[in-house]
Amino acid sequence: MNATPYRMTPDVIRSVVQKYRPGAYILGDENNGQLIFRYVGRSDCCLQTRLLTHGLLYHCSYFIFSYTNTAKGAFELESKWWHDCKNSGMNLLNIIHPDSPTGSSLLCPYCHFQNGIKKY
């Protein structure tokens, strides 16, 4: 994943994350020069507000993020990052799979693919 880590402070969040944009994010901490991922999440409508009100705001030192155009895109990116982290053996704080956006019946494209494989 090629993304710039930013300090997880309200001032930094306000200066680098635009309002009213959906997207996904990863919160983490630094250990020996590496960003250790701790939490994968998303916002379906305002990434800035989600980060500013996050329960881990003062518990994780860094965040990375990416905007998406839609809530569906945010869900799919969050799901991808969550699966990538889990498949790499990372010990995330959020162990429960990302939920689909409110009012939607979207399925995770990564779980759905695996569930669709026929077993012989």
Model-derived regions, located:
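Boundary/linker segments flanking structured domains
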Residues: 1-37, 42-120
